Amino acid sequence: MATDDWFLSARERGNPASGLPDWCEDSHAEPLIHGSAYFAALAREVEALGPGDHLFFTDWRGDPDERVRDGGPSIGELFASAAGRGVIVKGLVWRSHLDAMAYSEEENRHLGEEIEAAGGEVLLDQRVRIGGSHHQKLVV
């Protein structure tokens, strides 16, 4: 399959103001098979960010107290610390159904509050059908 078959054309992307390429040579992707490997790599990358760097994320269930490695920090502390260092932290988290229905309403709200208190921005997104959800997880 040709590279052009994998990516949208500039017209299909629909954002003529963007100068971001859809592809670049020498890209590297490393599969992280287990959650502990993922969280350890995430912690290393986020801790290396400095003022003016960007951290964008989406989340379905944002447990702010989830530890990224033994002894901490939690995901909330990790992202809040980045915001406190001047990293531009922006998140889009699913605005969960009520906790009474065994969902993650409080956790998602608390993750956003912790990051926003440190200077980041987290929006709760509920653009779904009734009873639906955004099952999304992404960090850039």
Question: For each predicted feature, which ranges?
Answer:
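HKD-type phospholipase D/PLD-like phosphodiesterase module
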Residues: 6-51, 63-140
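Structural motif
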Residues: 54-58
